[in-house]
Amino acid sequence: MKRAIRDDASLTAENEFSIKLAGIPIRVHALFRSTKEFCRYYLTEEPPLFEVTITMERIKKIRMDAIVCDLQGGRKPQNYTDNYLETLVLLEFVADEFLSRNILLFHGSAVAVDRKAYLFTAKSGVGKTTHTKLWLNNIPGTHVLNGDKPFLLFHEDDVYACGSPWRGKEGFGRNEMLPLAGICLLERDNSNHIESISYQEALSVLLFQSHKPAQDARMVTYLKLLSRLSSVPLYRLGCNMENEAAWVSYKGMAER
């Protein structure tokens, strides 16, 4: 049975479409045609498992949230367009609903080689994008599964990295799903070195970089999903911006 997630607005049919993310078909009732274009690589005709309806009230709320976030980060508040904010509302709705379907939204750059995905994560400005480009330029056969916000699908004992339309400023990404072979926490350093770390050592970063539900009732589900990342090999990489950094992380994860 479909479950609707909707506010109180009525929408025109021309802005209705379906997308498939992490194997889940979703019906979207959008306000702007640009949102369908934003999701163009994920469109589907499959019957949806749930629906999302976006309203101006939700867009206004997320605008205020974005302003607060900018101010807290010491940045001048940006004049975000309603079209852009609608994509964030959609992401928030989907990420919350996905928790009950064993899918977690994660902030990081997922690169792929040899049909396996490796997820790099770090605080903003540390160099996820730079390190991703080093892999593209140095590791043969590498491509980017998602450059900013992949979904992580938990299925039985396995974890899969899944593409999404939210691919970051560079637009790196593909609509595919691959086994997640490692999560790597990036730190700046003068030399390049990588080490395996425990789930407890990685926990503070995993908490910070994963999507937390807006509803308290879903927090237990979120924490249970997060704990399942303990089954994924975890690493800490100290790196600079030289080509060697890509080889150190590749050999430290893919060749183990």
Label the model's feature ranges.
Residues K128:
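Conserved lysine of the Walker
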Residues M1-S124, L134-L145, F151-R256:
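A noncatalytic interaction/capping subdomain that flanks phosphate/NTP-handling catalytic cores
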Residues H131:
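Hydrophobic positions on the alpha1 helix immediately C-terminal to the Walker A/P-loop
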